[in-house]
């Protein structure tokens, strides 16, 4: 790829939001396309974002005793069919291996769309007593789901994710674990991604296949469409009964275990791009950015300038993810390149800066430049990074709140949907939900734990039972 291609202007998000998003994914060198639709190549800069999400989660898992494992990519179709609700939910997008070379397989193999059945089969083998509980397992892996419409990070035939699978003696322990996971994801959004989420319980129609309860985190993109960014499921004893996962309690009674599963994926990277970026390219929150600070000597052949740039690099590299750019490119090209890549801070050092005892620091999130004393600027960097993160979160939160409405009539609901964003309405249940999706394209995101807006459902005129947040979504 020629260097000029990496600094071409991206499409304006106002003229074509979808192309703007794709341009950023490609031109910021996050991904490349493979020869099979829906299977992307994660380039180093894009994969580093996922690695930083993994690091954050692993740090949290170490505190709570969750252990990482890795289970196989394939399992038998017979195993897949053991939980009837689960297979009905995933069969349409499950990919199968039916032959090897010229030989047809006696039994089809399922390529992992999710791993509940594999974990359940294993748990049935190793759990027999209350002393074996709880089991707190997690794996980072890839999954394959044969999606029709694909988009980098947001919806692919293959994607990367984290999936937790836990087993407990009681319903309460499992429900607590289900809430722990969704609260962890909310914390991940706030502390690492600068992403505010709406968190809540899914409706019966939208819950995970095979679960009793599903919670989700929902993000709102700049174009007003919602994105489900993570889920946590209480599976009850559904899989335990299908796979006969039983234990003997302290009273010597045989009981079924209670299970949970929960996960986030590379969809978080898609949300990160769509929520924060602008027409110049990526804008990355500093704590997830692969490069937090780039140092650009304005006259790289000037020995004094180069020496000062290297000194700054050496001073910062043990604390931050720093890159010193000594390429034989113009400063303007480098500025555009790192703005496209969303690097939070850029330190510029030139002959004039040296003479004045200063450095210039550019902040990507608001495209501002300020001069700092070269003797004291290092103390300002952690403050700048925190301010950038906080401001990015606040901006996204403000956008979310400004695009959250409620409706008392069905017509008002439709009118609000035209503006995009979230619309809350009290409904009678699944019948109303199905009609809303059919007629407007909006889907239920989460149930709100708030009083009813109206006593009757505006869609069916039946008694309203819950207030639900709706949106059009990716």
Swiss-Prot record:
It comes from the Bacteria. InterPro entries: aa-tRNA-synt_IIb (IPR002314), aa-tRNA-synth_II (IPR006195), aa-tRNA-synth_II/BPL/LPL (IPR045864), Anticodon-bd (IPR004154), Anticodon-bd_dom_sf (IPR036621), Pro-tRNA-ligase_IIa (IPR002316), Pro-tRNA-ligase_IIa_arc-type (IPR004499), Pro-tRNA_ligase_II_C (IPR016061). One of its GO terms (molecular function) is proline-tRNA ligase activity. Its main location: cytoplasm. It is found in: Cytoplasm. It holds the Pfam family ProRS-C_1. One of its GO terms (biological process) is prolyl-tRNA aminoacylation. GO terms for cellular component: aminoacyl-tRNA synthetase multienzyme complex; cytoplasm. It catalyses: tRNA(Pro) + L-proline + ATP = L-prolyl-tRNA(Pro) + AMP + diphosphate. Coiled coil: none annotated. Its EC number is 6.1.1.15. Signal peptide: none annotated. Keywords: Aminoacyl-tRNA synthetase, ATP-binding, Cytoplasm, Ligase, Nucleotide-binding, Protein biosynthesis. Catalyzes the attachment of proline to tRNA(Pro) in a two-step reaction: proline is first activated by ATP to form Pro-AMP and then transferred to the acceptor end of tRNA(Pro). Homodimer. Consists of three domains: the N-terminal catalytic domain, the anticodon-binding domain and the C-terminal extension. NCBIfam families: proS_fam_I. Belongs to the class-II aminoacyl-tRNA synthetase family. ProS type 3 subfamily. This is Proline--tRNA ligase. It comes from Phytoplasma australiense. The gene is proS.
């Amino acid at each position: 790829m020629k260097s000029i291609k990496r600094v071409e202007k991206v499409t304006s998000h106002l003229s074509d939001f979808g192309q703007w998003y794709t341009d950023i994914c490609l031109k910021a060198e996050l991904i490349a396309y493979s020869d099979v639709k829906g299977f992307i190549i994660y380039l180093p800069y894009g994969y580093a974002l996922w690695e930083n999400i993994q690091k954050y989660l692993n740090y949290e898992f170490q505190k709570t005793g969750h252990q990482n494992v890795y289970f196989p990519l394939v399992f038998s179709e017979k195993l897949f069919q053991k939980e009837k609700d689960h297979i009905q939910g995933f069969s349409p997008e499950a990919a199968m291996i039916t032959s090897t070379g010229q030989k047809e397989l006696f039994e089809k193999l399922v390529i992992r769309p999710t791993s509940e059945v594999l974990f359940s089969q294993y748990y049935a083998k190793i759990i027999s007593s209350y002393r074996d509980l709880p089991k707190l397992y997690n794996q980072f892996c890839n999954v394959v789901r044969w999606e029709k419409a694909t988009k980098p990070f947001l919806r692919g035939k293959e994607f990367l994710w984290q999936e937790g699978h836990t087993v407990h003696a009681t319903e309460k322990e499992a429900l607590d674990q289900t809430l722990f996971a969704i609260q962890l994801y909310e914390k991940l959004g706030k502390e690492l991604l600068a992403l505010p989420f709406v968190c809540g319980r899914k409706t019966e129609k939208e819950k995970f296949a095979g679960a009793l309860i599903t919670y989700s985190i929902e993000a709102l993109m700049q174009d007003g469409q919602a994105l489900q960014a993570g889920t946590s499921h209480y599976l009850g004893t559904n899989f335990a009964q299908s796979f006969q996962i039983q234990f003997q309690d302290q009273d010597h009674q045989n009981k079924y275990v209670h299970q949970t599963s929960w996960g986030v994926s590379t969809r978080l990277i898609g949300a990160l791009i769509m929520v924060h970026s602008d027409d110049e390219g990526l804008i990355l929150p500093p704590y997830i950015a692969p490069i937090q600070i780039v140092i650009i000597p304005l006259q790289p052949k000037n020995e004094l300038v180069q020496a000062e740039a290297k000194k700054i690099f050496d001073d910062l590299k043990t604390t931050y993810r720093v890159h010193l750019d000594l390429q034989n490119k113009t400063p303007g090209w480098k500025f555009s390149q790192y703005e496209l890549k969303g690097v939070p801070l850029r330190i510029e050092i030139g002959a004039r800066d040296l003479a004045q005892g200063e450095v210039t620091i550019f902040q990507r999130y608001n495209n501002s430049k300020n001069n700092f004393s070269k003797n004291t600027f290092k103390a300002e960097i952690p403050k700048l990074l925190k301010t950038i993160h906080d401001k990015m979160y606040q901006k996204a939160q403000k956008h979310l709140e400004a695009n959250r409405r409620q409706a008392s009539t069905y017509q008002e609901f439709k009118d609000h949907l035209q503006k995009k964003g979230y619309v809350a309405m009290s409904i009678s249940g699944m019948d109303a939900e199905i009609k809303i999706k059919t007629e407007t394209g909006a889907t239920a995101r989460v149930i709100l734990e708030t009083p009813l807006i109206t006593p009757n459902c505006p869609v069916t005129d039946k008694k309203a039972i819950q207030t639900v947040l709706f949106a059009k979504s990716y």
